[in-house]
Design a protein with these regions (language model features):
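Structural signal for hydrophobic/aromatic residues that build the beta-strand cores
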Residues: 54, 70-71, 99, 126, ...
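N-terminal cap/lid segment of alpha/beta-hydrolase-fold proteins
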Residues: 24-63
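Short amphipathic alpha-helical molecular recognition features
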Residues: 77-80, 118, 144-145
Length: 171
């Protein structure tokens, strides 16, 4: 395993200003849960003959996209219907990006066939998902994870080391 190097840091000089019609943290948290758009997508067959569901923003598959693709990994017991997943999808839409929201096993609403569950250290399956997305997408690919999804993504990046750049352009 390669040693983890600290990322270059830069000071953010922008201050967040909430829209007048959406003041306060509570309303900003509730808004995406109430008004975000839903996405749908196909199931992928895994190497162990199970399946993973991946939801895409708009067109159903990223193959024709040259624009950036944002991949959002959900938290514990989350899904593409989690308010934060829909909020990320809305941001991607506003920026003209594609967005993919893969479900970890058992989180898409359907019971999986294989007796395998997801966990925060499952970096192999995370790598498989990212490699499959990279093969299908020609544009820049960025990955983000929320809570457990962030932990699994960073574990994958640490395990992959310099090879991570073959699958993603940014984590």
């Amino acid at each position: 395993m390669m040693p983890v190097r600290p990322a270059e840091s830069s000071q953010c000089t922008l201050n967040y200003v909430a829209p007048r019609w959406l003041p306060g943290g509570q309303l900003q948290t509730i808004w995406p849960a109430l008004y975000s758009r839903r996405v749908k997508g196909p199931a992928w067959t895994t190497p162990d003959a199970d399946f993973l569901d991946v939801d895409y923003l708009q067109d159903g598959a990223p193959t024709e996209f040259l624009r950036p693709l944002l991949v959002v990994f959900h938290g514990l017991e989350g899904s593409s219907r989690s308010h934060y997943g829909e909020a990320f999808a809305d941001v991607a839409r506003e920026r003209g990006w594609a967005c993919a929201l893969p479900h970890f096993r058992g989180c898409s609403g359907e019971i999986n066939r294989a007796p395998r569950a997801y966990h925060s250290g499952d970096h192999e399956e995370m790598g498989w998902m990212l490699e499959r997305l990279r093969r299908a997408h020609r544009g820049p690919l960025m990955a983000v994870g929320v809570s457990l999804g962030g932990n699994a993504l960073l574990r994958w990046a640490a395990e992959a080391g310099a090879q991570a750049g073959r699958s993603v352009d940014a984590v």
